[in-house]
């Protein structure tokens, strides 16, 4: 299963504080951008918000100015400038592995979009990501206001946005009752689909304005939402039905918490959200590829059986699932390998085809995979798009 690590959805430990000509502060070897000040309390680290116009947080030694084009070579030709890629959920798992692979290439600056600054800063240092190769900006996909603020903060960096990777996800397979986002949506669909939908729509103009040779929007999919596969047929199967739950708001009060209007099932909610992700990618392609030149793609990088996304599963599952994938199904891939595969979809010239769902064979070669009938239903994609626009306030 192409499952991505997702962090807990508690409020962030950081918020921005505007102080005029504030000086940079150092904390655990990480520099905070202008406008941030930390207070230590018995409960941990906090900031006090004075002005809601927050600014982005920079990694240690990262320059505030955007990467620029490389000067002309002796032959008189300009080389391609460093690309800038936003990755959601980059503090662990697939997101962190992808951020590391891109940063280590020397060709990319990574904007790590995460809820917890300190966790992300420590993870980047532990992974050995080069100093100056990344910027950490707060994003909580369980809040549409946070998504909008993130877009404002990223634009304050004055960097062109060349690639957006929608990777973060929440998975609650053992939950008996639904939990909800700040906006009242069932958590899995609210974070995995609606939060990313708003983010991608808001950043589309930035991608369109990019002068990078190959600008891309990538939404991580999952084999579990693809019912034309063996894994996709493991109960409960993904099924969006007639979208009656989505149309009613997924709030579990005046409507069902599930997209199809059925009773809540945490595992199915995740799978349904991944179907929405794959439908959304295709609808982006149909609506905007020709106009913008942006490549829209999804992928299944392989089964990352050790990912932290399984932390809410029962202990026996967490114990047995990795060896089962390694030795029985042979579908296991490490976080490092999966990160390299996602980095390929970000940067490889051979993977520029738009509207594609990428997978890898046993020889680690990429290929265009087929989607199930539901995950490729153009009419359902249109309906999901239009309902999502209303739910996130774009229509």
Swiss-Prot record:
GO molecular function: protochlorophyllide reductase activity
Subcellular location: Plastid, Chloroplast
Entry-linked InterPro entries: NAD(P)-bd_dom_sf, Prochl_reduct, SDR_fam
Domain of life: Eukaryota
Key words, A-Z: Chlorophyll biosynthesis, Chloroplast, NADP, Oxidoreductase, Photosynthesis, Plastid, Transit peptide
Gene Ontology BP term (one): photosynthesis
Transit peptide location on this chain: 1-59
Reaction it catalyzes: chlorophyllide a + NADP(+) = protochlorophyllide a + NADPH + H(+)
The enzyme's E.C. designation: 1.3.1.33
Pfam family for this entry, one: adh_short
Pathway, per record: Porphyrin-containing compound metabolism; chlorophyll biosynthesis
Gene Ontology, cellular component aspect: chloroplast
Function, as annotated: Phototransformation of protochlorophyllide (Pchlide) to chlorophyllide (Chlide).
Family the entry assigns: Belongs to the short-chain dehydrogenases/reductases (SDR) family. POR subfamily.
Name of this protein: Protochlorophyllide reductase B, chloroplastic
Encoding gene, per UniProt annotation: PORB
């Amino acid at each position: 299963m192409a499952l991505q690590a997702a962090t807990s959805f508690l409020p962030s430990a950081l918020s921005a504080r505007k102080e005029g000509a504030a000086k940079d502060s150092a904390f655990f070897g990480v520099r905070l951008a202008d406008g941030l000040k930390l207070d230590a309390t018995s409960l941990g680290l906090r900031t006090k918000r004075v002005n809601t116009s927050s600014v982005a947080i920079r990694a240690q030694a990262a320059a505030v100015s955007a990467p620029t084009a490389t000067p002309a070579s002796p032959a008189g030709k300009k080389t391609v400038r460093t690309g800038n890629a936003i990755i959601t959920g980059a503090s662990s798992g697939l997101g962190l592995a992808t951020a590391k692979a891109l940063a280590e290439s020397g060709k990319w600056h990574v904007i790590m979009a995460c809820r917890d600054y300190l966790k992300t800063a420590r993870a980047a240092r532990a992974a050995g990501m080069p100093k100056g190769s990344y910027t950490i900006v707060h994003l909580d996909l369980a809040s549409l206001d946070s998504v909008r603020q993130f877009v404002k903060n990223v634009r304050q960096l004055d960097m062109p946005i060349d690639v957006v990777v929608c990777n973060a996800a929440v998975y609650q397979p053992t939950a008996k009752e639904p939990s909800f986002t700040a906006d009242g949506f069932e958590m899995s669909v609210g974070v995995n689909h609606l939060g990313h939908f708003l983010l991608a729509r808001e950043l589309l103009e930035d991608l369109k304005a990019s002068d990078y040779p190959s600008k891309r929007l990538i939404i991580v999919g999952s084999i579990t939402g693809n019912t034309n596969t063996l894994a996709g047929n493991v109960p409960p199967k993904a099924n969006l039905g007639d979208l009656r739950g989505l149309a009613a708001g997924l709030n579990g009060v005046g409507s069902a918490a599930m997209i199809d209007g059925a009773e809540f099932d945490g595992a199915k909610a995740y799978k349904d959200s991944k179907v929405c992700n794959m439908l959304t990618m295709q609808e982006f392609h149909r609506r905007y590829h020709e106009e913008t030149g942006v490549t829209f793609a999804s992928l299944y990088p392989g089964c990352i059986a050790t990912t932290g996304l399984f932390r809410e599963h029962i202990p026996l599952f967490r114990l047995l699932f990795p060896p089962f994938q390694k030795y029985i199904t042979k579908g296991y891939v490490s976080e490092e390998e999966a990160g390299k595969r996602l980095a390929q979809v970000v940067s490889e010239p051979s993977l520029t085809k738009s509207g594609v769902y990428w997978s890898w064979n046993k020889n680690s070669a990429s290929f265009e995979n087929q989607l199930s009938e539901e995950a490729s239903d153009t009419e359902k994609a249109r309906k999901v798009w239009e309902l999502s626009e209303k739910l996130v306030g774009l229509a």
